[in-house]
């Protein structure tokens, strides 16, 4: 046993002392150690993950105000989300499809049936003018003591549906329902003149019959001419004008009686 004690005492003989450990200090957070110089730009999270310096977020400086935190990034602008400014957006009327220049050109085409019509303009779906003309037609009937708004809208819907089916069977290119409703609505303008005459005098005499026949021919001729120019239906104007005359004849009967 004495030999074993001597061996242990010789094995553990070092220059290390516990008293020296208490006197020695280690600076892990400061800049005194060798590791602080080499890894000063790195950050170690609580879970022990290494974060490179280029991925570190800039620290916010304290402003001294509790309810007003410091903004690390500038606030986003509306241009960031939408891409373009509000000044570059199209006008509201253009987004709704309302073009007063085209409305005026279509109105002049109806008022001048012998004038050459532009098929590209008439092929557009524009319901702003037809709605206004339907309201004006109902208003003039109301001035004559006839409350026929329901009949006007009902006959208009049925007539547009019938012409839509007929034109799709007759034309090679086909036509949309909006285009048919737009053309028939614009060609209702002469019928507003007939209902306005009915406010002043009666249309049940010979003069009224001649005026009614003229207005029906005017409306049907304008509508058929626009349809054949927009759909390239040369030589079929009479075939298109006949159903148009039947439709506008119903509106004329409402105005006369």
From Swiss-Prot:
Cytoplasmic side: 1-124, 168-173, 218-236
Record's GO cellular component terms: COPII-coated ER to Golgi transport vesicle; endoplasmic reticulum exit site; endoplasmic reticulum membrane; nuclear outer membrane-endoplasmic reticulum membrane network; trans-Golgi network
Metal-binding listed as a keyword: no
Its membrane topology: Multi-pass membrane protein
Subcellular location: Endoplasmic reticulum membrane; Golgi apparatus, cis-Golgi network membrane; Cytoplasmic vesicle, COPII-coated vesicle
BP-aspect Gene Ontology terms: endoplasmic reticulum to Golgi vesicle-mediated transport; Golgi organization; insulin processing; protein transport; regulation of ER to Golgi vesicle-mediated transport; vesicle fusion with Golgi apparatus
Lumenal topological domain: 146, 195-196
Main location: endoplasmic reticulum
Region (Interaction with Sec23): 75-106
Subunit and interaction comment: Interacts with the COPII coat components Sec23 (SEC23A and/or SEC23B) and Sec24 (SEC24A and/or SEC24B). Interacts with YIF1A. May interact with RAB1A. Interacts with YIPF3 and YIPF4.
Family statement: Belongs to the YIP1 family.
Record function comment: Plays a role in transport between endoplasmic reticulum and Golgi. In pancreatic beta cells, required to transport proinsulin from endoplasmic reticulum into the Golgi.
PANTHER family documented for this protein: GOLGI MEMBRANE PROTEIN YIP1, PROTEIN YIPF5
Name this polypeptide is given: Protein YIPF5
